[in-house]
């Protein structure tokens, strides 16, 4: 058995250059041995668990959808909103919600306290992320690359 105490885990903080987006994560699965860059399913683990903290007046990440990844959230403390294709939905401690692949989403802390959530994702191999507001993609091969492209015919450049 592998065991960690999440109260003792360090946090990795992510902040955008102008500060609109910010969150901190405790990478629980990685502390339990998950190797996110591996293609070995035993090293990758079947799911990824993190404790995410979003400061007041911040969004966790730009509005995005995953091509193949499921994400489950459970609000531990605080309150805020979730932006998805249906609009804005209020969330508070005790709420749980899930996003299936292809469904754009974003966590917004419009409150005055930290918004803390459990995040469980299945992190499948070969997934990509689409950002509808900026019309760009993030792909991994194996490092993450951000791209934007005009639509092309499937056979463009092939014949």
Where are these regions (language model features)?
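Ligand-binding loop in jelly-roll beta-barrel domains
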Residues: 81, 101-127
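Conserved short histidine dyad/triad with adjacent acidic residue
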Residues: 30-37, 50-66, 101
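Short acidic-glycine-tyrosine-enriched beta hairpin
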Residues: 86-102
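Short, conserved beta-strand element in jelly-roll/cupin
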Residues: 46-47, 51-55, 65-83, 121-124
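Short beta-strand segments
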Residues: 61, 87-89, 129
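A short, N-terminal "cap"/entry segment at the start of jelly-roll beta-barrel domains
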Residues: 1-46, 133-159
